[in-house]
Amino acid sequence: MKVLLIGSGGREHALAWKLAASPLLEKLYCALGNPGIAAVAELADIGVDDHAALIAFAKEKHIDLVVVGPEAPLVAGLADEMRAEGIRVFGPSRAAAQLEGSKGFTKDLCARFNIPTGAYGRFNNAPKAKAYIRQQGAPIVVKADGLAAGKGVVVAMTLQEALDAVDSCFEGAFGAAGAEVVVEEFLDGEEASFFCICDGKTALPLGSAQDHKRVGDGDTGPNTGGMGAYAPAPVMTPEMVARTMRELIEPTMRGMAEIGAPFSGILFAGLMITSDGPKLIEYNTRFGDPECQVLMMRLNSDLLALVNAAVDGRLDEVSLEWKDEPALTVVMAAEGYPANVKKGSVIRDLEKLESIDGVKLFHAGTALKDGAIVASGGRVLNITATAATVAQAQARAYEALKLIDWPEGFYRSDIGWRAVEREKANR
């Protein structure tokens, strides 16, 4: 099969690496890609927002399957446009991608189909949002309705923080994404990311992960797209997975079909595991980044065969095989992230990681300049490891990371701390 992968981050490098291992693959292309992806795929210089060029490329190369990595082209309707041209594509329609594209849409769906989530209000002006916040009190959560690259959420511990967050949304901090605001109940518990692959009818669990949103050690500083992750999430016991499928995922699949937008693609539930069980924080309609990297490290099954089954509506015939070992990934980011990122610094000695057992390096915001790898984005490298325990995977990843010569890079030194503490307690 000839496959076109769309995207250029660490998530897409992990997908490319896994797709490239499939015996079904004849040729892999990636638009835009990065220097890490270039090792397993032929890169095409087409941006993810240039739908016409992507469609033309898919036709010219006789692509059998398109796999869309990031959320923005899905919310913008790329999958619909490709399907209309007779191209097989893995990813939800524009209507189904509203689960990620509009927080308000998802909250209304939860209300209609009795899916457990925090109480909420939707507002298109600041005075009404502020009145609701004053009525509810803090802590409370303020979210921009639309896509804001994972940065449109403020968990306000004080009333003033919440009111300021409303102002920044309506003053245009998130552009069109902040034209509507969702204010919701603060949920207490432990967060987990839970993934399913879906074909419109069937949802098949792809496992859980826990990511680390804040930029600094000890979960301090501003939110980011994610500074590291590990899988599986210990809080997602078999019983909790069964409850999540029964109480959240299956009603969502039924609800989306009922409103005429059946969901196919990756459904990523951001969960809060509370004393009452799992509650939905938000849905995303693609793999998480960096959660995808740890899921791919643990997946033994053929990813291309799996995606094919999803596109053809055959997931009810599929069973998956996983490594028993946990996986952990640490993000190396460029100085200044998540604010003003310094780009262009040279990264050396990446080849030293190739010989380390159980370690895989995924490229994210990297580029090739004059024969050298340079930082071209905020999150730049993902050092990923598997081992018998999370503590061992953590040690392995950090040991590998220290071989990289990149003074302008930084990372959190405590990725996986919750799971490591749990392992110590359970010894």
UniProtKB/Swiss-Prot annotation:
Concerning InterPro entries, the annotation shows:
ATP-grasp (IPR011761), ATP_grasp_subdomain_1 (IPR013815), PreATP-grasp_dom_sf (IPR016185), PRibGlycinamid_synth_ATP-grasp (IPR020561), PRibGlycinamide_synth (IPR000115), PRibGlycinamide_synth_C-dom (IPR020560), PRibGlycinamide_synth_C_sf (IPR037123), PRibGlycinamide_synth_CS (IPR020559)
Q: What class of enzyme is it?
A: ligase
Residues bound to ATP:
133-193
User: Which pathway?
Assistant: Purine metabolism; IMP biosynthesis via de novo pathway; N(1)-(5-phospho-D-ribosyl)glycinamide from 5-phospho-alpha-D-ribose 1-diphosphate: step 2/2
Q: What is its EC number?
A: 6.3.4.13
Q: Name one GO molecular function term.
A: phosphoribosylamine-glycine ligase activity
The protein's name is Phosphoribosylamine--glycine ligase
The lineage, from the top, is:
Bacteria, Pseudomonadati, Pseudomonadota, Alphaproteobacteria, Hyphomicrobiales
